[in-house]
């Protein structure tokens, strides 16, 4: 048991530990946001009429945009493909949800959106980590260029 704990501790404290943390963060936040997007797809017709339209694009179009971001961008985040670009629509969506959707900003109403926002900003700054399709593509391109 102590060898397993020691190995786990060494792995988490190594440089790979941060890459594993980014992988887990991407997978967990991606799946969680994906559930929001899938729920919007399943109830699109019912939501369309009363969906908040805080920036004046129309309720249906606002719903379509956030649904595409929550599903499409979350899938990209999960696999780590164009991760820094993929989190930008999610950051915008969470800013709109946190600061514009509900009148009179309150922490209670905005807490979940702010939590997602902080995670997406972290991924924007840190990138997807070593265990991502972005890294695989970078390594493949580097090999092709060097040959």
Describe every region a protein language model picked out.
Residues 1-42, 60-68, 72, 79-147:
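Extended, low-polarity transmembrane helix blocks
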Residues 47-60:
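Perimembrane loop-to-helix junctions flanking transmembrane segments
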């Amino acid at each position: 048991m102590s060898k397993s704990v020691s190995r786990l501790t060494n792995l988490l404290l190594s440089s790979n530990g941060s890459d594993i943390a980014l992988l887990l963060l991407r997978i967990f936040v991606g799946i969680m946001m994906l559930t929001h997007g899938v729920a919007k797809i399943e109830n699109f017709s019912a939501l369309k009429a009363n969906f908040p339209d805080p920036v004046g694009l129309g309720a249906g179009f606002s719903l379509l945009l956030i649904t595409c971001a929550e599903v499409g961008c979350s899938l990209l985040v999960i696999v780590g493909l164009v991760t820094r670009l993929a989190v930008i629509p999610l950051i915008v969506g969470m800013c709109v949800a946190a600061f514009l959707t509900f009148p009179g900003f309150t922490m209670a109403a905005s807490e979940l959106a702010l939590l997602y926002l902080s995670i997406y900003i972290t991924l924007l700054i840190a990138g997807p980590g070593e265990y991502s399709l972005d890294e695989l593509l970078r390594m493949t391109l580097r090999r092709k260029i060097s040959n």
